[in-house]
Amino acid sequence: MTAWRAGVRRGALAGLSTFLTLVLAGPVYAGAGRFSTADAPPTDKIVADVVSVNGSGCPAGTATVTVLEDHTAFRVTYHDFIAVAGGGSQPTDLRKNCQLGLLIHVPQGFTFAIASADYRGRARLAAGATGLQRTNYYFQGSPDDTFVDHPLAGPLRAVWHTTDVTPVAQLVFAPCGVFRNLNINTELRVNAGTVAPGVVSSMSMRSTDGDIDTIFHFSWKTCP
């Protein structure tokens, strides 16, 4: 059984499309090639360097980045990203965030934008509890006020899958010939609510919870 619900869009890119899938019978994976790009991906090597990692959701050494072999996307894997509320949890457990700074080395003559992003995680929310996944991403020197919220409500025990898609006319490409960090900010929040505040609720994006990762899809363009 699959349920669909729209997320909440905030910031400058009001046209950003977003949807949420709750996967109750098993995870659903959005293939890397299903979003069209302006130009074909470059065939030469692409490297994604993690230049900075900050936040309570990704202690040092717990987040990895891998470029897919077909150069259509890159994968972010978190190993210890979980927010918890209720029971004996601490106030600092209710909200976890991870801020990644990536430097993506692309072949000369190419530039890229982020066309879409697929997020997956697991929710264990008691009755009355709520959860939230929030993300924004932007190039160094660009406005960072665009973010997307995906709320969840208990009772819920499921793998969730959310997707954000940027309209072609609103794609933001990295400047040609200039190295700019791509900053990715992701946040998880859980509120135990008042129905069963003593029951533990959680929302996670940990690879230890199954086939859990985040895929950022490139849109490629050749430079003049």
Predicted regions and their residues:
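Cysteine-clustered segments with highest specificity for TGF-beta superfamily mature ligands
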Residues: R75-T77, R157-S201
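Short, solvent-exposed beta-strand/turn "edge" segments of beta-rich domains on protein surfaces
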Residues: G86-R95, I104-A113, R124-A126
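Beta-strand elements of well-folded, non-transmembrane domains
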Residues: D80-I82, L100, I104-Q108, D118-A127, ...
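N-terminal leader/pro-regions and domain N-caps
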Residues: G31-G87
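Proprotein-processing/basic-patch segments
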Residues: V190-P224
